[in-house]
UniProtKB/Swiss-Prot annotation:
Protein name: SPbeta prophage-derived uncharacterized protein YopJ
Gene: yopJ
Naturally occurring in which organism (per UniProt): Bacillus subtilis (strain 168)
């Protein structure tokens, strides 16, 4: 899957938040270690928060997806050449700026995509986050 890309798409549904706010929040998390990011992601999944008019989803594609003006690629990874911390930074920011109800689904969807996309990153992500999220549902 060398020519396939993993995209995180974040969408500002009402145009109120803006991609600049996303990038500023992402930068504020950049000093955290991988382990701190993992713990923060786990916290964000379980915290009940008011609805945020934004959504986040994951795409695997060989071509650059076409998005509208409110949809932004906030992470792009290449199979076999992914930076785990960079992926976690985009994930924690997307979770912080989206509806709590979608968080578990997004974590499990990302794990599913990673399983066929990058085995090494999948193993780390499953061990660090996805398995705990999955078993918390049972």
């Amino acid at each position: 899957m060398k020519n396939t890309f993993l995209y995180f798409r974040w969408e500002d549904l009402h145009g109120e938040i803006g991609v600049d706010s996303f990038n500023l929040l992402r930068a504020s998390y950049s000093n955290l270690s991988e382990q701190q990011l993992v713990e923060l992601i786990k916290e964000l999944i379980s915290i009940e928060r008011e609805d945020i008019a934004a959504k986040f989803d994951i795409h695997l594609s060989e071509n650059a997806p076409v998005f509208d003006e409110r949809q932004h690629v906030v992470y792009k990874g290449v199979a076999g050449d992914m930076n785990y911390k960079d992926m976690l930074l985009s994930l924690v920011t997307a979770l912080d700026l989206t509806n709590t109800l979608d968080h578990v689904q997004n974590i499990l969807s990302l794990a599913k995509c990673l399983r066929s996309f990058d085995r090494e990153i999948f193993a780390r992500f499953a061990k660090d986050i996805a398995e705990e999220v999955y078993y918390s549902l049972k």
